[in-house]
Design a protein with these regions (language model features):
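GNAT-family acyltransferases
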Residues: 2-126, 137-138, 142-172
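ATP-dependent phospho-/nucleotidyl transfer catalytic cores
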Residues: 131
């Protein structure tokens, strides 16, 4: 999934001296940096969750037509953005690291009133058990406690995508 900020900010997304959280671990799952080494498990999670992903990220056709090669390119992009501190993609894995359960994206936003936007998804097979709601709750708490943001948007979670898209830009 390619999550792009609408426009680069003249200020860094996070302060230069901010220590980026390595991840989050609960009794159920672990978040850690998404890397190219996750491609096989990530690809399987994405393609088996395609219908759900089109609901989580409306208005597009992703991940229709995604190949493992394209997923590898996407993961490399996310990994490089993480290293450059311009956005942060975390894979959500089981504690044994045997399965990818979803992803969390912490991104800059150009929306006035917000200094970050967080997007997340859980694999379709885990929805009935409530994983996505538990993941969202844990991530919101983690962001509030560990990250330097004052105001975070969660499009599609407490704020409709349509509402988020209509927010004025910081540039206007």
């Amino acid at each position: 999934m390619q999550i792009e900020s609408a426009a680069p900010s003249p200020a860094p997304f996070v302060p230069d001296d901010f220590q980026i959280p390595a991840g989050l671990e609960t009794a159920e799952f672990r978040l850690r940096m998404l890397t190219v080494n996750d491609v096989v498990k990530d690809f399987e999670a994405v393609v088996t969750s395609a219908e759900h992903l089109k609901q989580v990220f409306p208005g597009g056709t992703w991940p229709d037509g995604l190949t493992m090669e394209q997923d590898l390119i996407d993961l490399g992009w996310h990994q490089k953005e993480f290293q450059r501190r311009t956005s942060f993609a975390y894979t959500v894995v089981t504690l044994s690291e045997s399965r990818v359960l979803g992803c969390v994206y912490v991104c800059p936003t150009d929306k006035r009133g917000y200094d970050a936007a967080v997007f997340l998804w859980a694999r379709q097979s885990e929805l009935a058990g409530g994983l996505e709601e538990r993941l969202a709750g844990a991530v919101k708490q983690w962001i509030a406690q560990e990250w330097p943001f004052r105001s975070v948007a969660y499009p599609g979670r407490g704020m409709a995508w349509e509402e988020y898209e209509k927010l004025p830009s910081k540039k206007r």
